[in-house]
Amino acid sequence: GIRDDIDAYIQKTYPTEEQRKAVSQYARSLQASLLVDLENKITVKAATNTTSRAISCIFKKVPSGNSPNGGSVVEEILGVTTNTKQRLLQYIALDKALDGTVISSPSGDVCDESLFTMPDQRL
């Protein structure tokens, strides 16, 4: 799921339901990616593909991919998600686990309009 602090940030920052859904999709995928088994290349790549879809959804639903704060939505959510040393180190380890892999740009419907839920695990 989405951490309470990130959900509150999204609710406060993004003015439309469509934008909140897109940003929430990214926040969920990013949070889930921090919990994958980094030794399992298949799950690492699957988590990254899910995050890539969510980023594409942001650019589809949020004008220019910019937040009302004037920054990049992706950078803002990444910043609030990796706001502790443990979370940042986990994100860096995930990035390192992706070394040498190729990630394709997602195609088709990149936005998950349903309010799907993932296990509520948090770092």
Residue ranges and their predicted role:
Residues 4-123:
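Calcium-binding acidic motifs and repeat modules
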